[in-house]
């Protein structure tokens, strides 16, 4: 596998794409907490993965306490593209079925087999890579990529970025209460 830096300064295409992603990040923050923000691009890169490769569960850092990260799927091998989509019709991961080979894994908690019996909500999700799909999430969100097994030259290619976020006003408990009271903003 390889990770290659994608320039976001001094490169016309990189600067343009950085601007688009920063606008999306500002919208993401505004829709999440209802506060306007300013953004700067921290880093952009591509990841080139081949049969047997995976990316262990990790999170991302930014220079600011609040950050946004994203993944865009650029190329997906046939061995992944032909798998079912767990968000549409999913029979689970019983008996190491390979049902999520090459998928992105998001986790924001811990889960166990008895969780449903204890009314504990699911705290993980698998996302099937589809060319052109962009997912954006808080930089603290732990994520990884499941290994896939295809032909030797099959490539799973993604673009990723980390975006620094500075709020234009201080976040208070009032923001939380408003967002969870059912009031419309």
Residues covered by each model-derived region:
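A short beta-turn/loop motif at secondary-structure boundaries
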Residues: 38, 150-153
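A short hydrophobic beta-strand segment most commonly corresponding to one strand
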Residues: 69-72, 152-169
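Extracellular/luminal regions of secreted and cell-surface proteins that mediate adhesion/ECM remodeling
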Residues: 140, 165-185
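Non-heme Fe(II)/2-oxoglutarate
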Residues: 1-36, 52-56, 98-100
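Catalytic core of non-heme Fe(II) oxygenases with the double-stranded beta-helix
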Residues: 47-136, 141, 146, 172-174
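A short glycine-rich, His/Asp/Glu-containing loop-to-beta-strand
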Residues: 39-48
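Short, well-structured alpha-helical interface segments that form or flank functional binding sites
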Residues: 16, 41, 65, 69
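Short edge beta-strand segments in beta-sheet-rich domains
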Residues: 41, 99-101, 154-158
């Amino acid at each position: 596998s390889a990770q290659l830096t994608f320039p976001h300064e001094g490169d016309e295409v990189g600067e343009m794409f950085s601007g688009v992603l920063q606008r999306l990040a500002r919208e993401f923050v505004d829709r999440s907490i209802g506060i306007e923000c300013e953004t700067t691009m921290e880093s952009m890169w591509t990841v080139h993965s081949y049969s047997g490769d995976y990316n262990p569960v990790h999170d991302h850092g930014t220079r600011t306490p609040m950050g946004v990260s994203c993944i865009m799927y650029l190329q997906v091998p046939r061995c992944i593209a032909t798998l079912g989509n767990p968000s549409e019709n999913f029979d689970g991961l019983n008996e190491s079925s390979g049902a999520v080979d090459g998928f992105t894994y998001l986790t924001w908690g811990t889960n166990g087999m008895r969780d449903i019996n204890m009314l504990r909500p699911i705290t993980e999700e698998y996302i099937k890579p589809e060319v052109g799909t962009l997912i954006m999430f808080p930089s603290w969100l732990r994520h990884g990529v499941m290994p896939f097994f295809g032909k030797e030259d099959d490539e799973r290619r993604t673009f990723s970025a980390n975006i620094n976020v500075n709020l234009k006003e201080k976040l208070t408990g009032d923001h939380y209460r408003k967002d969870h009271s059912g009031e419309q903003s």
